[in-house]
């Protein structure tokens, strides 16, 4: 069962030298070709901002009672209504919030989506849209999220050169 309430407030969030630490996730889905290689076609899931004027990847504050990977998973569930395998970190970015004028540390992770939920905590606040990578790069509001997407594309392109073995533990599935 999924909790249909998002965490709110900043009292239990992590800070480093005055910078709020936020964690984001790039939900994606792959296609595996018949010869066992990963197709270069994959899509990423973007969400609308709460006010609906911008597109981005799920992200939010990293809470004191969770690991960074747990935070990435929670944000994807709360904001985009997806669950899956959180993979190795894409990187850390320091950025300035245009609206608040404060600095943040942003950690980004890829998530191979295993399930899209029909009900999720912020479904009435946000839209979710599957896009091709180029479309998402153009649509995404934040430069640091675009850079994280480029890291993911590079990582997955390296995987696509290698045929999949049946006993490999890579969390790759075909959802097309």
Curated annotation (Swiss-Prot):
Its cofactor is Mg(2+); Mn(2+). Residues 1-21 form a transit peptide. SUPFAM superfamilies: Nudix. The keyword Manganese applies. The keyword Mitochondrion applies. GO terms for molecular function: metal ion binding; pyrophosphatase activity. Probably mediates the hydrolysis of some nucleoside diphosphate derivatives. A motif (Nudix box) lies at residues 60-81. Coiled coil: none annotated. Expressed in roots, stems and inflorescences. Keywords: Hydrolase, Magnesium, Manganese, Metal-binding, Mitochondrion, Transit peptide. GO terms for cellular component: mitochondrion. It is found in: Mitochondrion. InterPro entries: DDP-like_NUDIX (IPR047198), NUDIX_hydrolase-like_dom_sf (IPR015797), NUDIX_hydrolase_CS (IPR020084), NUDIX_hydrolase_dom (IPR000086). The lineage of its organism: Eukaryota, Viridiplantae, Streptophyta, Embryophyta, Tracheophyta. Its EC number is 3.6.1.-. Mg(2+) binds at residues 75, 79. PANTHER family: DIPHOSPHOINOSITOL POLYPHOSPHATE PHOSPHOHYDROLASE (PTHR12629), NUDIX HYDROLASE 18, MITOCHONDRIAL (PTHR12629:SF68). The gene is NUDT18. This is Nudix hydrolase 18, mitochondrial. Belongs to the Nudix hydrolase family. Residues 22-153 form the Nudix hydrolase domain. It comes from the Eukaryota.
């Amino acid at each position: 069962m999924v909790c249909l309430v998002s965490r709110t407030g900043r009292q239990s969030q992590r800070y480093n030298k005055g910078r709020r630490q936020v964690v984001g996730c790039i939900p994606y889905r792959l296609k595996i070709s018949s010869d066992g290689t990963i197709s270069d076609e994959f899509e990423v899931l973007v969400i609308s901002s709460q006010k609906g004027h911008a597109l981005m990847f799920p992200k939010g504050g990293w809470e004191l009672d969770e690991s960074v990977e747990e935070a990435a998973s929670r944000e994807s569930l709360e904001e985009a209504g997806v669950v899956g395998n959180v993979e190795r970190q894409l990187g850390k970015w320091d950025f300035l919030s245009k609206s608040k004028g404060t600095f943040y540390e942003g950690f980004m992770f890829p998530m191979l989506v295993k399930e899209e939920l029909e009900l999720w905590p912020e479904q009435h606040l946000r839209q979710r849209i599957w896009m091709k990578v180029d479309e998402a790069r153009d649509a995404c509001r934040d430069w640091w999220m675009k850079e994280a997407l480029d890291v993911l594309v590079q990582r997955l392109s390296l995987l696509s050169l290698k045929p999949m073995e049946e006993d490999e533990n890579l969390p790759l599935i075909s959802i097309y």
